Amino acid sequence: VSPPTVIRAARAIGFTGFTELKIEIARARGTAQFFAPPEVLTADATLASVLETSIRAGVDALTALSGAIEISALDEAVDLIQSARQVFAFGAGPSATVAADAVFRLRTAGVITVSIQDYLSAMIAARLLGPGDVIIVVSSTGRTSSTLSIADAASSAGASLIAITNQYDTPLATLANVSLVVGGMPLPAQMAAAGSRLA
């Protein structure tokens, strides 16, 4: 079967293309719990319940990643980072911890990376980026307004934008030079950062 035929078939059943279809298939084959609503932790949750929910969020994130991530996009992101003059990372809310974790991991690999937590400082830094610079922007939804503003400013300044998100068809994924879609069900706020950090 030719690639154009596969793409047309994917579009005919409601997907934007083969990549989106592939991600949905990976999600479906992951676990039976994948389509169940994620458990929301309550104030009276037991320690065992918190532990089980945390482990399940991690397993689901890694299962989704195994079928969702595009190796070619990951290769492109690695190339951009390795050749970058400087690397910045930004995420808002729960995504800030994922961005900070990415910075830590890149630093341990010898890549000088900066995470800027507050919006104003991040906006100033984004506007000062230029060609040869990379900004990694993390957003589970790909629609957070502050994150999109930072991404747009960095992109307008000429920096390469790597998006880490859960969905393809978002403003952030559209704006990015490289989108690393890690897939997975949206998680409650308490679990979102933990699952995304693992992925």
Tell me the role of every PLM-derived stretch.
Residues 67-85:
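Glycine-rich beta-alpha loop segments
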Residues 82-198:
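Glycine-rich phosphate-binding loops that contact phosphosugars or nucleotide phosphates
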